[in-house]
Amino acid sequence: MAIFHREQHRMQRIGWLRAAVLGANDGIVSTASLVLGVAAAHATHSGVVIAGAAGLVAGAMSMAAGEYVSVSSQADTERADVALERKGLSADKKGEMEELAGIYVGRGIDPALAMEVARQLMAHDSVGAHARDELGISALLPPRPIQAALTSAGAVAVGAAMPLLTAVIVPAASLIPFVAGVSLLFLALLGGLAAHAGGASVTKGALRVTFWGALAMAVTAGVGALFGRVA
């Protein structure tokens, strides 16, 4: 009779969740800080909006480029390691089997059973067995550079749109408090949601994200105000 594993572990979603949260958080903080900094320097309303729009595009493209390069490098490294394993298997299959069995012994399996497991796994897919258990490379989660780039860019754009739309809607006289308030609210919601999905404290998650967002906005607004007086 088949046994189904019904548990849904949070680690299964932590990868995409972390990327989405980081992207949206970066979009909110960077764009809100830019808008507040330019507004504090006494720029015109249209100038503030243009700066925010430029920040959204620049942030999304920067994140997309960074993710693409990072994940592509990971994919290149994994391919090189798998190619090296394939050469090792061709040169010394017995030695590679003993190496794989040693990994299982280190995990607590009886040596004789570990050797049998290694033998059967290598008979089924020798390269896959070594890639998974020796190198930690999973065929279920291959690196996808384009997907990672688009996901990160989208998350940044969605996050950045919140303070930007606020800056577009509210009048210039109320821009700074409204943008700051809306951005901090969304940061708190984002931090709390991510903490809840990851099984952590919602309050701590919300406070952590909000604190660093508020700090970034305050510093940028202060710098903008300073240069606004000097210029």
What positions do the PLM features span?
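Small-residue-rich segments of transmembrane alpha-helices in multi-pass membrane proteins
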Residues: 159-160, 208-221
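Structural signature of hydrophobic alpha-helical transmembrane segments
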Residues: 173-185
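Interfacial loop-to-transmembrane junctions
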Residues: 189-214
